[in-house]
Amino acid sequence: MTKKIIFTGGGTAGHVTLNLILIPKFIKDGWEVHYIGDDNGIEHQEIKKSGLDVAFHTIATGKLRRYFSWQNLLDIFKVGFGVMQSLFIIARLRPKALFSKGGFVSVPPVIAARLLGVPAFIHESDLSMGLANRIAYRFATTMYTTFEQEQTLVKLKHVGAVTKVTAPKSHSVASKQLAAVLEYFDPNLKTLLFIGGSAGARVFNRFITDHPELKEDFNIINISGDPSLNELSRHLYRVDYVTDLYQPLMEMADLVVTRGGSNTLFELLAMRKLQLIIPLGKEASRGDQLENAHYFTTRGYAEQLLEQELTLPHFQEKVREVFAKQSDYLSAMTSSSELQSPESFYQLLSADISSATKEN
């Protein structure tokens, strides 16, 4: 009988990326792969775009809020209906395991898996669990964590960050692919790369627009998320979105100015890039980026600047500070043991699935 596994997770790219890394490995080993998500979510878009042989099953999903809202009442029914749909899907497929990367759409399948006796494995990217994973943890077999946790919860297993990204071996790729950009850049200036999510990028975009004098001291790469800003001019390259150029652009950067999302932070750690983290505050998030940034700064991987302190003088001071302590940051990143290759995590997950199914 063909082994089956169900993946779930969505809402943001960060809740899909690891699944897309793992799915080809399961397919290669002869597994039949299914995905439970939202037809209108990024998870459905990414699965279709990947071309992977994956059967997609859609369920109802609702956002779980930490504050009172009448919408919560409707969403409770949506989540309940999503659990019923997931029960039907999982009972019909009879998979050996379910793997969840989080997000609100993942809660019903994890609950359903537990009710049907199917081992459920969850991956948590942030230092503290989001609401969805806090609920899902109660129904999980194992929760893998990216960050070392102070809490000693019995089902937690620290694995570090799972990433395909590695430290660049040379700058030749960047030189070939971005020859036009390099013509506008001054090789005698340091290159800063700004990258953030949708809300985070807008703050960076405005900061760069408001301070054209930055271009006198640095080459600037701005991954903006806004095609109307696309520009290539003296000491400035603004691009809305990158895929194949992501790694070459990172190779060009001497320092990356980023938000505090864990996926990006650990990719930069893997590439050993100097980082200045400007995390989203509690007014725009649940505070997870502040926690992630604090974790990275206390371990000597990066420097932090709070968004409310983002003025040109403060920014320039922090950038100078990072470059002054460059060797310290690189030493800390080089000696870090917080990264794991996709292959090693796949082997660990496979072993845990085998162990859990034997126990059942």
From Swiss-Prot:
<dbReference type="GO" id="GO:0009252">
    <property type="term" value="P:peptidoglycan biosynthetic process"/>
</dbReference>
<dbReference type="GO" id="GO:0008360">
    <property type="term" value="P:regulation of cell shape"/>
</dbReference>
<keyword id="KW-0328">Glycosyltransferase</keyword>
<keyword id="KW-0808">Transferase</keyword>
<keyword id="KW-1003">Cell membrane</keyword>
<keyword id="KW-0472">Membrane</keyword>
<comment type="similarity">
    <text>Belongs to the glycosyltransferase 28 family. MurG subfamily.</text>
</comment>
<dbReference type="GO" id="GO:0030259">
    <property type="term" value="P:lipid glycosylation"/>
</dbReference>
<feature type="binding site">
    <location>
        <begin position="12"/>
        <end position="14"/>
    </location>
    <ligand>
        <name>UDP-N-acetyl-alpha-D-glucosamine</name>
    </ligand>
</feature>
<comment type="pathway">
    <text>Cell wall biogenesis; peptidoglycan biosynthesis.</text>
</comment>
<keyword id="KW-0573">Peptidoglycan synthesis</keyword>
<keyword id="KW-0131">Cell cycle</keyword>
<feature type="binding site">
    <location>
        <position position="289"/>
    </location>
    <ligand>
        <name>UDP-N-acetyl-alpha-D-glucosamine</name>
    </ligand>
</feature>
<dbReference type="GO" id="GO:0051301">
    <property type="term" value="P:cell division"/>
</dbReference>
<keyword id="KW-0132">Cell division</keyword>
<keyword id="KW-0133">Cell shape</keyword>
<dbReference type="GO" id="GO:0005886">
    <property type="term" value="C:plasma membrane"/>
</dbReference>
<dbReference type="GO" id="GO:0071555">
    <property type="term" value="P:cell wall organization"/>
</dbReference>
<dbReference type="Pfam" id="PF04101">
    <property type="entry name" value="Glyco_tran_28_C"/>
</dbReference>
<protein>
    <recommendedName>
        <fullName>UDP-N-acetylglucosamine--N-acetylmuramyl-(pentapeptide) pyrophosphoryl-undecaprenol N-acetylglucosamine transferase</fullName>
        <ecNumber>2.4.1.227</ecNumber>
    </recommendedName>
</protein>
<dbReference type="InterPro" id="IPR006009">
    <property type="entry name" value="GlcNAc_MurG"/>
</dbReference>
<comment type="function">
    <text>Cell wall formation. Catalyzes the transfer of a GlcNAc subunit on undecaprenyl-pyrophosphoryl-MurNAc-pentapeptide (lipid intermediate I) to form undecaprenyl-pyrophosphoryl-MurNAc-(pentapeptide)GlcNAc (lipid intermediate II).</text>
</comment>
<dbReference type="GO" id="GO:0050511">
    <property type="term" value="F:undecaprenyldiphospho-muramoylpentapeptide beta-N-acetylglucosaminyltransferase activity"/>
</dbReference>
<feature type="binding site">
    <location>
        <position position="198"/>
    </location>
    <ligand>
        <name>UDP-N-acetyl-alpha-D-glucosamine</name>
    </ligand>
</feature>
<dbReference type="Pfam" id="PF03033">
    <property type="entry name" value="Glyco_transf_28"/>
</dbReference>
<dbReference type="InterPro" id="IPR004276">
    <property type="entry name" value="GlycoTrans_28_N"/>
</dbReference>
<dbReference type="InterPro" id="IPR007235">
    <property type="entry name" value="Glyco_trans_28_C"/>
</dbReference>
<dbReference type="GO" id="GO:0005975">
    <property type="term" value="P:carbohydrate metabolic process"/>
</dbReference>
<keyword id="KW-0961">Cell wall biogenesis/degradation</keyword>
